[in-house]
């Protein structure tokens, strides 16, 4: 009996340590209303992005009658929906990518070191929690935070690392990167 209680306490401690490695950002909070027989019942909806700043990121949505409870639900949802994104040199994207969700479209471009995060609102929160330090991003169409976050995740999902491209083509990564560097020189010579 005492051993079970001890083990449960240790599990909780490990879980708290694991949770502390994540950085969370509140992207949007919104007051919502449910129409009931007696009138309107007001609550809150929260959109949270969470990440470990090392390539794992997730987003979650939560609704509750009180703001802190909505944020907690959104954070729990984000922890359940974590995805891994391959980063180049641990600081930027491997290539330029495009993502869309609904009317929201985003363009993400890899950037040289020292550029910083050039992105607006919800996209900036995703990049900061993901650990990207250099990126240029542009959103076109819907400015709805939910659509922008989902479009950003859609774009990140379509990114390929050189290792995955090389595996798909059955070639070595060094060959692929030599073509990438040498390809520009060959085009200039022609």
Swiss-Prot record:
Part of the 30S ribosomal subunit. Contacts proteins S4 and S8. The keyword Ribosomal protein applies. Keywords: Ribonucleoprotein, Ribosomal protein, RNA-binding, rRNA-binding. NCBIfam families: rpsE_bact. It comes from the Bacteria. With S4 and S12 plays an important role in translational accuracy. Located at the back of the 30S subunit body where it stabilizes the conformation of the head with respect to the body. Pfam families: Ribosomal_S5, Ribosomal_S5_C. The N-terminal domain interacts with the head of the 30S subunit; the C-terminal domain interacts with the body and contacts protein S4. The interaction surface between S4 and S5 is involved in control of translational fidelity. GO terms for biological process: translation. GO terms for cellular component: small ribosomal subunit. This is Small ribosomal subunit protein uS5. Belongs to the universal ribosomal protein uS5 family. Residues 22-85 form the S5 DRBM domain. GO terms for molecular function: rRNA binding; structural constituent of ribosome.
């Amino acid at each position: 009996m005492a051993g079970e209680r001890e083990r449960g306490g240790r599990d909780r401690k490990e879980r708290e340590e694991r949770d502390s490695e994540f950085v969370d950002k509140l992207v949007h909070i919104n007051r919502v209303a449910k129409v009931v027989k007696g009138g309107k019942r007001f609550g809150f909806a929260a959109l949270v992005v969470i990440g470990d700043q090392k390539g794992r990121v997730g987003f979650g949505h939560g609704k509750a009658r009180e703001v802190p409870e909505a944020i907690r639900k959104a954070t729990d949802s984000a922890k359940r929906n974590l995805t891994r994104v391959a980063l180049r040199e641990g600081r930027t994207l491997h290539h330029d990518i495009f993502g869309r969700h609904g009317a929201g479209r985003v363009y993400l471009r890899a950037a040289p070191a020292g550029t910083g995060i050039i992105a607006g609102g919800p996209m900036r929160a995703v990049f900061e929690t993901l650990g990207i330090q250099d990126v240029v991003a542009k959103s076109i169409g819907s400015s709805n935070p939910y659509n922008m976050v989902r479009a950003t995740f859609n774009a990140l999902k379509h990114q390929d690392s050189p290792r995955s491209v090389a595996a798909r083509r059955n070639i070595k990564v060094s060959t692929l990167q030599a073509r990438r560097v040498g390809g520009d020189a060959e085009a200039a010579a022609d």
